[in-house]
């Protein structure tokens, strides 16, 4: 009988497939409010989930670090598109001007650049090692100052998105509240999952389940 740990990477890869399908399904609903940003969120979640599955499956440290560079595209993109989705869904799409969009993207783009050039400065993470957990091969790092600044940015815009959705939830009739509650719960689960992983309280030590926490909500929204 296969150990449960062996299935974990494939669960993430399977989740990535669902995210792609949800994104394609949502894309067909254009130009409904928030659809484009939701579809892009699904794409970024797919990148994050798929590459994380590879990261914990492939043993060599050098390979893990290469995969992490691609994975960080999804990590950096998800909160931004969630923020844009919240603005569009709550009727504030007029705020998303080209200048505002560039301003919001500036820091994630810089964080992504720092991640890709991390071997030169180690501002994002350092002391990279591989830890074995049963059949899993986990990347362990010591987070740097730039990583924590990026996390502060991520939490800030996700919390802002949550506040916007809660405000809209309180103003909508009962029939409309169900879908909004799905989004709010998804943000809460994702926020809690990321925080628990960073603080070392993951259900499986060293495994980041954040890419999975948003999937039930995404299915409900789509």
Predicted feature descriptions by range:
Residues 14-16, 75-79, 149-161, 188, ...:
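Generic alpha-helical transmembrane segments
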Residues 20-25, 81-88, 154-172, 221-222:
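Alpha-helical transmembrane segments in multipass membrane proteins, preferentially the mid-helix core
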Residues 11-29, 36-59, 73-84, 104-122, ...:
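Hydrophobic alpha-helical transmembrane segments of multi-pass membrane proteins
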Residues 62-73, 204-214:
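Non-cytosolic membrane-interface motifs at loop->transmembrane helix junctions
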Residues 39, 52-53, 151, 167-169, ...:
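Interfacial "cap-and-anchor" motif at the non-cytosolic start of specific transmembrane alpha-helices
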Residues 90-147, 177-187:
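The cytoplasmic-loop to transmembrane-helix boundary for the fourth helix
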Residues 1-18, 146-154:
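Hydrophobic transmembrane alpha-helical segments in integral membrane proteins
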């Amino acid at each position: 009988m296969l150990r449960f740990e062996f299935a974990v990477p494939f669960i993430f890869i399977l989740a990535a497939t669902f995210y792609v399908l949800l994104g394609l399904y949502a894309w067909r609903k254009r130009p409904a409010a928030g659809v484009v940003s939701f579809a892009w969120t699904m794409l970024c979640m797919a990148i994050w989930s798929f590459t994380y599955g590879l990261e914990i499956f492939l043993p060599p440290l050098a390979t893990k670090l290469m995969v992490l560079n691609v994975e960080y595209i999804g990590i950096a993109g998800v909160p931004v598109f969630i923020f844009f989705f919240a603005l569009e869904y709550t009727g504030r799409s007029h705020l998303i001007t080209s200048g505002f969009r560039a301003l919001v993207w500036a820091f994630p783009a810089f964080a992504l650049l720092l991640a890709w050039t991390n071997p030169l400065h180690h501002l994002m993470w350092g002391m990279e090692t591989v830890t074995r957990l049963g059949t899993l091969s986990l990347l362990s790092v010591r987070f740097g100052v730039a990583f924590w600044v990026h996390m502060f940015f991520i939490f800030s815009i996700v919390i802002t998105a949550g506040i916007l959705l809660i405000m809209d939830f309180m103003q909508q009739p009962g029939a409309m509240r169900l879908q909004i509650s799905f989004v709010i719960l998804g943000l809460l689960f994702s926020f809690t999952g990321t925080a628990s992983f960073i603080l070392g309280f993951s259900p499986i030590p060293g495994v980041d389940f954040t890419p999975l926490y948003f999937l039930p909500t995404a299915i409900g929204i789509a």
